[in-house]
Swiss-Prot record:
PROSITE patterns: ATPASE_C. It comes from the Bacteria. F-type ATPases have 2 components, F(1) - the catalytic core - and F(0) - the membrane proton channel. F(1) has five subunits: alpha(3), beta(3), gamma(1), delta(1), epsilon(1). F(0) has three main subunits: a(1), b(2) and c(10-14). The alpha and beta chains form an alternating ring which encloses part of the gamma chain. F(1) is attached to F(0) by a central stalk formed by the gamma and epsilon chains, while a peripheral stalk is formed by the delta and b chains. It comes from Thermotoga maritima (strain ATCC 43589 / DSM 3109 / JCM 10099 / NBRC 100826 / MSB8). This is ATP synthase subunit c. Belongs to the ATPase C chain family. Disulfide bonds: none annotated. GO terms for molecular function: lipid binding; proton-transporting ATP synthase activity, rotational mechanism. It is a multi-pass membrane protein. The record marks 68 as: Reversibly protonated during proton transport. F(1)F(0) ATP synthase produces ATP from ADP in the presence of a proton or sodium gradient. F-type ATPases consist of two structural domains, F(1) containing the extramembraneous catalytic core and F(0) containing the membrane proton channel, linked together by a central stalk and a peripheral stalk. During catalysis, ATP synthesis in the catalytic domain of F(1) is coupled via a rotary mechanism of the central stalk subunits to proton translocation. Key component of the F(0) channel; it plays a direct role in translocation across the membrane. A homomeric c-ring of between 10-14 subunits forms the central stalk rotor element with the F(1) delta and epsilon subunits. The chain crosses the membrane at residues 10-30, 65-85. InterPro entries: ATP_synth_csu_bac/chlpt, ATP_synth_F0_csu, ATP_synth_F0_csu_DDCD_BS, ATP_synth_F0_csu_sf, ATPase_proteolipid_c-like_dom, F/V-ATP_Csub_sf.
Length: 85
């Protein structure tokens, strides 16, 4: 009977770690794709209008920060899964 309790505790830990890993892994896909698109379009815009490099860079960094928020939220949720559950 004692082994059954250890098995249940081990499965609970497995679920917790697997859930946090999936949360972070899947939650990082969107920001990665979004930031890549932002960077690609910013480079295209800088190649077309070299005189606007400063403005384009500023807006690119701001858009990257906004795109990264979902990754940060998934990191916070992963930490909550690890520490609270």
């Amino acid at each position: 009977m004692e082994n059954l309790g250890d098995l249940a505790q081990g499965l609970a830990l497995l679920g917790k770690y697997l859930g946090a890993g999936l949360c972070m892994g899947i939650g990082a896909i969107g920001p990665g794709i979004g930031e890549g698109n932002i960077g690609a379009h910013a480079m295209d815009a800088m190649a077309r209008q070299p005189e606007m490099v400063g403005t384009i860079t500023t807006r690119m960094l701001l858009a990257d920060a906004v795109a990264e928020t979902t990754g940060i939220y998934s990191l916070l949720i992963a930490f909550m899964i690890l520490l609270v559950v």
